[in-house]
Amino acid sequence: MLELMASITKIDSPVELRERIDRGDLVVNYGLQVVYRNQGNTVNPATTDQTASPYGAQALQPDQLPEAIPFDGISVTPDVWFKLYYKALTIEAEGVGIFGRILHPGALAAEDHEIKLAEAGWVVASELRLFKDSFFVGFEVGGASGDQASDPGQYLNYAWRYVQQPAGDYAIHDFHFSPDYHVDEIFFRHIMGTVTNATYFKPSASYWFDLGRTRAIGINGSVIYSMAQVPVSTPGNAINYGIEGDIGVTYRNTGEGVYGGVTWGLFFPMAALSRPQSLFPNDYVDASSAQILRIFMGVRF
């Protein structure tokens, strides 16, 4: 594997940023990163005999050594980011693309044929601070490209799964967000595992009550509507995933680095997550609602 990376960034220090915002300046921080990857081979582990030997550990035989097989993958990943500050308004956006090809895709495709990579993901998030930074109103919209390849027999969690490209399909388009980027509490976080083949819209609001001496309690809530970019790869072959509402209460003490809280979420699935009778005559079912209660606490040090 050969990987090369180049980047350009412009980020103000926290002190300078605070001073410029207080003066009413329009502040823009930005970054550009490009990553090039070239992988010649991949390793296919060979099946070995796990039977214990009465003579102790033995040297590997030639037929037990991992097998190096051709992969010949090349990709270029551009990543553009910027964050704008103007008085009480903050707008942040990031866009990522993956472009390249794999000459020998192996298990990624049903045929040993060159496949193209063309994937993209993006997020735009805004926040407006009101009432002396006590009331926050936000809106976030994001998306990740999807692919028409589907496998209704698999679980839906894309944090670990992949769908093999069928014969005649020589391109991969499904982009996956990092599973550590949490948009909600239920659908993307636990059902899908990450954001992929989706566009979502998320308005949110929170209010913080100052308790003095660096302590505060916040009440927050958000609503997320999500839809598929490529409906044919959803279980229900439809566009609407569903609507989720999340509310929570958080306590924080910035002086001592202590925080904790509780969050409750409720998700109402739509047609894209059901299994309609027209597609599954012997195994059709309507998706049901889901809810979650999450308690968290931590110490920063």
Residue ranges and their predicted role:
Residues I191-M192, Y207-R215, N253-G257:
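Short, charged helix-to-loop "capping" segments that act as catalytic/coupling loops
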